[in-house]
Amino acid sequence: MKAWLICLLVICAAVIAEPVESRNYIEYGAINKCAGPNPPPGCNPPGAEQKNPTPVNEYSRGCSKIHRCRRD
């Protein structure tokens, strides 16, 4: 009796564990935050031209004429 029960459980497990069709890759839309329903700030709407980023701080060596720093 126990052997039949074990055989039945093995057969049921084999039927249930049948391979499921799935993709082996993630689509770009799933990882693109700007394509979602609530895009974060800084994302351009779809179809809009890409804006060139404006530099936040201009380069400065940290020494100006008013501070009388040594010049090279």
From Swiss-Prot:
Q: Which InterPro entries match?
A: RALF
Query: Under the GO molecular function aspect, what terms does this record hold?
Result: hormone activity
Q: Any idea where this protein resides?
A: Secreted
The signal peptide here is 1-17
Pfam families (alphabetical) = RALF
State the protein's purpose. Answer: Cell signaling peptide that may regulate plant stress, growth, and development. Mediates a rapid alkalinization of extracellular space by mediating a transient increase in the cytoplasmic Ca(2+) concentration leading to a calcium-dependent signaling events through a cell surface receptor and a concomitant activation of some intracellular mitogen-activated protein kinases.
The Swiss-Prot or TrEMBL record describes its family as follows: Belongs to the plant rapid alkalinization factor (RALF) family.
GO BP terms, alphabetized: calcium-mediated signaling; cell-cell signaling; regulation of growth
The answer to whether keyword Disulfide bond applies is yes
Which GO cellular component does the record give, naming just one?
A: condensed chromosome
| UniProt-recorded name of the protein | Protein RALF-like 11
- What lineage does the source organism belong to? Eukaryota, Viridiplantae, Streptophyta, Embryophyta, Tracheophyta
Query: Got any disulfides in this one, which pairs?
Result: C34-C43, C63-C69
List keywords of the entry alphabetically: Disulfide bond, Hormone, Secreted, Signal
What is the superkingdom listed in this entry's lineage? Eukaryota
